[in-house]
Amino acid sequence: IAPRPQKSIPVWLGVTSKVAMRRAARIGDGFTFASAGKSTVELANKLREMISEEGRDSSTFPIEFNMPYGLGPEKWGDLTDQARNASISHLCVNTMSVTSAWSGTPPSGLESVDDHIAGLERFITAVT
């Protein structure tokens, strides 16, 4: 790579097996969860414990929730509140319907670029 980065490039990890979470706690620069919800909050708390056990400051370790847009506004607010209460530092809103097939969540129903932009505006309005 030229020019060489002035700082190391952050490496975020994400898989919720105990071994993978321990590895993230030991060497990761951040962690991303593929979903959002109560079990994710519990896993985030467990990850913070592991980070502390590794002698690292868990309060500065970024953690991301991934929220499927297809869940709809009736769930967005609650899940966003759970993320805030759990001190989740990042929130990804997944508007791609293709991922709903493997995640088991409702598709977003968004097709065009304008649909996606309007969808993100609806999300922001619903959670702020």
Protein language model features and the residues they cover:
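Active-site-adjacent structural elements that line small-molecule/cofactor binding pockets in enzymes
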Residues: I1-T128
